[in-house]
């Protein structure tokens, strides 16, 4: 699926399970169970040990299914590239990282850039992010989003 197809799929499905586990083996089982349970998009966070191996294994096992595997908590371009090469179809960052946006664009993958201030949101957009994820939004609530 190309980048526009991935974006449309994410927008159409509107459900992403963010998964974490205490080990890579557990993580693979969680990803498979979530996908087999009908969740169309699964985000594997880089905070879990063995996340890259999990992405690679899950991407191969679920190839051809409706499940879309992405990666979250991406902090640098090297991790972004490694995750894409392992099979991640989309990238999520908790912070604004211009090198991550550039790497995702180089590989034709959608990127959700973490941003908090209006300046960060605009900077992410101008750098080519596909989505700005206001993070951490829970500390300011919906009125902040409305004001922006």
Give the positions of each predicted feature.
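Conserved anion-binding
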Residues: 50, 65-66, 75-78, 84-148
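Conserved N-terminal beta1-alpha1 strand-loop-helix module at the mouth
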Residues: 1-86, 106
